[in-house]
Every structure is written in C-alpha cells, then in structure tokens.
Design a protein with these regions (language model features):
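Short amphipathic alpha-helical coiled-coil/interface segments
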Residues: 38, 89-97, 267-274, 331
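Stable alpha-helical structural segments in soluble proteins, enriched in small hydrophobic residues
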Residues: 45, 89-100, 385-395
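Positively charged, helix-rich recognition surfaces that bind polyanionic ligands
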Residues: 6, 15-18, 29, 171-472
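Long, hydrophobic, amphipathic alpha-helical segments used as structural scaffolds
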Residues: 46-53, 97, 101-108, 183
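Acidic carboxylate diad motif detector
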Residues: 62-171, 324
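Gly/serine-rich nucleotide phosphate-binding loop at the start of the catalytic core
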Residues: 1-86, 466, 471
Length: 472
C-alpha cells in the first residue's frame, strides 16, 4: 500500500514514466504468464461473487476481505504470481466496483460493475517489494520460485529512493513498465521563481496548439502543423497498407489463422507507434510553453477551455477534427508540467475570445485566416494571440492586465516527427505524393513530350521540361 505522508511534509507530485523492457524469450514468457495469472485472479473474484449472488449473499468487494480470501488460497495458487502482485489486482477490482456504485448513486444508469473476464491484467508492486539498479529490475515471484530480473531499455528518469511503485503492462503486443515516483516541486532561486502577480493567457487551437499572451508585450505561438501532418500521413499510410494487403488479406472465415494474427499485430504496432509519436509531441509542446512561462516569471496561466466547441453537432468531418485534436490531452499535459514548475493554472470559458477586439471590446466577424483586424478601432494581430489576450482578461483573480503582444516567439511542436526537419524525409510522404500525382492532383508530375507528327514543323514537343516541384 502507498505510504502515508505527514501533514507538515513538503509537497510532492506523483509523476509516471513508461519504460520498455528488454527481456529474453524466457523472461518474456514468464512476464506474460504473470499477466495471465493476474487475469486468473480477476476471474476468481468474478466467480466468487457470482456464487455468492446465487446464494443470496452480499458481494465480496472490500479490499481487506478480498485479501483474506487470497490468504486462504495459499502460496503458488496462481503460478509465479506473488501475493503483492495479486493484491494489486484485488485493489483494482475493489476500486472499479466502488466507482461504479458511486456513479450509480449519482444517477448514472450506464455505469456497470466489473463483470467481464480479462485475459491480461496489469500488475503493480509498491516500494519495498522490488528493486531498481541502473537498467536492471528485480520483480518478486511466488515462494520457492526464482526472482525475475529484467533489463530495461533505458534508465528510470527518477532516483531509486523516489520510486513508489512499478506496474507491468502490455500494449500492442509489447511489455512496458510504468514507474510512478514522488517528484518535489521545482526549486527557484530568490527573485527567480514564478510571480503570482504576472499572468498569461493561453488559447488552445488545432493549427497552433498553444498561443500565449504574456506580460510585457511578450507572446508565444507553438505550431502544430507537424502533428497534423503526422495524423494525415498516418491515415494515408494506413489506407495504402490496407489496399496493398487487400489481395492477400485473410477472409472473414479465417479468423484466428496465422496470417490473420500477423495482420492484426502489424496494425496494432503501427497504431501504437502513431499514438506514441503524438503523445511525445504534445508533451514537448507543453514543455515549451511552461519553459517560456518560467523564463518570464509567469505565476498564473489562464487557459481557455474549449468545452463549448465539443458540445455542438457540426457534422462528421468537424467531429473527426475534434477527435484528432484531443483538447483534454493538451490540457492535461499543460497542467501537469505547470504544476511541477509551481505555476497556477486556471480554466475559463473561451467562447467568443477570437471574435472580440481586446482594445474596444466590440464583436467582429471571426476571421477565416490567421490575421485579426478590427473594423472599429483598427487593431490588427495574430488571431490566436487576440484570443489569448481576451482569455487572460476573463480571469477575476487579479493580476497585471495582459496587452496585445508586440514581440512574438514562434516555436514548432513535434520536431522529432519524421519529415519535420529540412534534411529529413518521411518515407510515407514519398508514397503519398506519388499516389496523389497518379490521381492528377498537385504536385503533378510532368508528362513526357509527345512526338510531333511526321512532316510537321512544330517544335513545341521538343521544349525542355522543368523538374517537377517537390513537396516540402
């Protein structure tokens, strides 16, 4: 169980990092078997409560009561799974049951109690039951079984004494370790920490994930075009792969065949890689904003909450853009990094922030481009920065008034993505551009000159053709 902290202890934050495992085939088989044993514990609890329900008894859902039943089973009941890992499954079941009961009492009829079997269940070990030394992890096993030592793909980014728990998870056919640690708040020197009187407005967007209007006429714009290109190229690449394997893909009657399993595994790997790339790009963009705010000594970030944008029904294409945008993930990344830096984050309604002039407070037609121009007072500037200024003005907690930025810093999010740099080339873009050229769309490939008919004096067909333009 997690330890209890004294009331007067310094404040800490809980952060997690996912580390891949470099296990041998024998170690991988033991790790997968541990996850299967966790699923067996989950199934036993379901069967136990089903039996009690048939007898008319109350369900057994308390964590301590479930642990007593586990102790009666004895060691070695679930293979190599030790009691600490099995108790983590019981904790997961108990939390899920009480969460569903709470939602039911609140009037949510769609909340369901745990009822389905799960083949693989994540296992968690708390501090004191495992050991991490460099890139080596030692996991406990059942009595009279050799412990499991696994090599990590990289060193854990936290000191060993700060690690509170490790969780063994499986995603897209790969094994990972989620490490949770206690991280202290960032320490700043005298006169260098965040100033609560300095405030900045943050506007969330699709083209530009973050547009920040700070004090002193400073502004920051983080571009997300590389992330949008990653989503578009991933979609085009997935469609191209499906077309390529359509002829050799297994039919519906061959479900479970070797070819079917390989096809599904390849799809899961591609989807998981796409999600990892976008997740890292979101964290990099949020880190850019927080680093900029720390340099400017901003103590409060007023973030526009686009909840109104998600409620409307604007059609299938707009809903798809919003799903790809994922504003909740952007807000979570920004909040976590700002909290670790000691910066307060406040969410306000952003409705109408990009169509209101921050100078004369008049509503204007929302510009279709990136340029905002007020027909009443003549104010002009970046549309997203105008929204950030209006968002900062909606906070009622005090602070300096944020004006229209005069010095704008531009940063690009997702610089690690394939094809984001000038000297790098995404192989998917080459395949996608050639497909577009075959359809006849831009950029078009120049056709070879036609031979003039015999006896004709025209020399148009002999003119040299320029090289076709290349997509950036």
């Amino acid at each position: 169980m997690p330890r209890k902290r004294p009331a007067n202890a310094p404040r800490v934050l809980h952060r997690s990092a996912r580390v891949a495992l470099r296990a041998t085939p024998a170690q991988a088989r033991r790790l997968w078997q541990l996850l299967v044993s966790g699923g067996d514990v989950w199934a036993c609890v379901l069967e136990l409560n089903a039996l009690r329900r048939s007898r008319g008894d109350a369900p057994l859902v308390g964590y301590q009561a479930l642990c007593r039943e586990l102790a009666r089973a004895g060691p070695g009941t679930f293979g190599e799974l030790d009691s600490a890992g099995a108790r983590s499954v019981l904790r997961r079941y108990s939390d899920a049951w009480f969460a569903a009961a709470k939602a039911r009492r609140a009037g949510d009829d769609t909340a369901r109690f745990p009822r389905r079997r799960r083949r693989l269940v994540p296992l968690r070990w708390y501090a004191g039951t495992f050991s991490v030394e460099g890139r080596s992890l030692r996991i406990p096993t059942a009595a009279r079984r050799p412990p499991l030592e696994v090599r990590l793909a990289r060193e854990v980014p936290y000191p060993p004494d700060r690690i509170r728990s490790v969780t063994l998870v499986a995603e897209a056919g790969r094994l990972y370790l989620d490490v949770c640690a206690e991280v202290p708040l960032a320490a700043h020197g005298p006169g260098q920490g965040p100033d609560p009187s300095l405030m900045a407005g943050v506007d969330l967007g699709v083209i530009h994930p973050f547009a920040v209007a700070g004090p002193g006429g400073e502004g920051l714009v983080v571009s997300g075009r590389a992330m949008r290109a990653e989503s578009r190229l991933h979609l085009a690449d997935s469609r191209a792969r499906r077309r390529a394997v359509a002829r050799r893909a297994p039919s519906k009657g061959q479900r479970g065949s070797r070819r079917w399993r390989r096809f599904r595994a390849r799809t899961r790997r591609i989807e998981a890689r796409h999600r990892r790339r976008l997740s890292q790009a979101r964290h990099e963009a949020a880190k850019t904003v927080v680093t900029w705010a720390v340099d400017k000594r901003v103590g409060r970030l007023v973030v526009g909450d686009p909840v109104g944008t998600l409620e409307g029904d604007a059609g299938r294409r707009h809903s798809q853009r919003l799903r790809d945008w994922r504003p909740g993930a952007w807000k979570a990344c920004l909040f976590d990094k700002a909290e670790a830096a000691g910066i307060e984050v406040v969410f306000v309604d952003e409705r109408g922030s990009s169509s209101t002039c921050p100078n004369c407070r008049q509503r204007v037609p929302k510009p279709s481009g990136r340029r905002f121009s007020c027909p009443h007072c003549g104010l002009a500037g970046h549309r997203d920065l105008v929204g950030a200024v209006n968002i900062a003005a909606r906070h009622e907690g005090g602070g300096d008034i944020v004006s229209m930025p005069e010095t704008i810093t531009h940063r690009r999010g997702g610089r690690h993505l394939p094809g984001a740099g000038r000297s790098r080339r995404d192989p998917r873009r080459i395949r996608w551009d050639s497909h577009r050229a075959r359809r006849g769309s831009w950029p078009a490939v120049a056709r070879p000159p036609e031979e003039p008919p015999e006896g004709s004096s025209s020399s148009v067909g002999a003119l040299p053709l320029e090289d076709p333009p290349t997509a950036a």
